[in-house]
């Protein structure tokens, strides 16, 4: 069930509620979300919130904020997560060929059963900033930094820096190159949620953490829109 508002003087919002489909329970496995965006001249701001509830092990069809049954590099016990919520705010400002962004998010994951290590709410606070320079209408250069801190039974920090370039061959096709470096400190959970291990370097949504505190990634690609 979703409602998207008209645009009122640069402001637009959207509300969504998804039923869990569990017989005899209205709220079980449900998802609630909302978002708003405002644009005025070179300034754009946005905020969003999502809450998803699982009453059992995450699997196909559950209200899972990640891929079903997958392991996120920052947190290995996805299948044991019950309710989770994420709040996010961001702002963007454009000056000539430059576009600057800043953002912050707070994510809270609660276990549906208490494990030896993952036995209470885990909170991830993330802040980031990025800058884009449009060299020509066809060439863009980007740089960014992201900081994440986890608290709860785990205690880890993650620093990630990245640089990229995009070349627009046409309105449909873009070539891109990305280089990134991540470094982690502290401790997090193992995949079973039963023990504490050293945090590993993790870049974006690669879904493959390093076996050491640091990770480097270089990505070359092409995108085509249809």
Model regions and ranges:
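Aromatic- and glycine-enriched pocket-lining scaffold segments that form the walls
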Residues: 1-39
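Short loop/turn motifs that connect adjacent beta-strands in outer-membrane beta-barrel proteins
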Residues: 9-10, 138, 171-172
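A residue-level signal for beta-strand positions that form part of recognition/binding surfaces
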Residues: 12, 44, 219
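Short, surface-exposed, polar/charged, turn-prone segments marking secondary-structure boundaries
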Residues: 22, 41-43, 65, 170-173, ...
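Short alpha-helix boundary/capping motifs
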Residues: 31, 64, 192-194
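Detector for outer-membrane/organellar transmembrane beta-barrel domains
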Residues: 37-167, 178-181, 213, 224
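Predominantly the C-terminal beta-signal and adjacent terminal strand-loop region
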Residues: 171-219, 225
């Amino acid at each position: 069930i979703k409602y998207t508002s008209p645009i009122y003087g640069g402001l637009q919002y959207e509300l969504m509620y998804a039923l869990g489909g569990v017989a005899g329970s209205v709220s079980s496995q449900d998802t609630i979300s909302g978002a708003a965006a405002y644009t005025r001249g070179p300034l754009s701001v946005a905020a969003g919130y999502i809450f998803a509830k699982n009453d059992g092990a995450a699997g196909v069809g559950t209200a899972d904020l990640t891929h079903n049954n997958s392991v996120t590099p920052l947190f290995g016990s996805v299948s044991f997560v019950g309710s989770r919520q994420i709040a996010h705010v961001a702002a963007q400002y454009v000056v000539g060929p430059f576009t600057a962004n800043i953002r912050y998010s707070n994510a809270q994951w609660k276990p549906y059963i208490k494990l030896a290590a993952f036995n209470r709410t885990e909170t991830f606070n993330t802040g980031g900033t990025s800058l884009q320079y449009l060299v020509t209408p066809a060439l863009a250069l980007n740089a960014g930094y992201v900081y994440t801190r986890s608290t709860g039974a785990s205690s880890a920090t993650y620093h990630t820096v990245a640089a990229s370039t995009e070349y627009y061959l046409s309105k449909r096709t873009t070539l891109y190159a990305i280089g990134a470096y991540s470094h982690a400190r502290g401790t997090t959970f193992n995949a079973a949620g039963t023990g504490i291990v050293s945090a590993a370097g993790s870049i974006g949504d690669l879904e493959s953490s390093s076996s050491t505190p640091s990770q480097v990634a270089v990505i070359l690609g092409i995108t085509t829109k249809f």
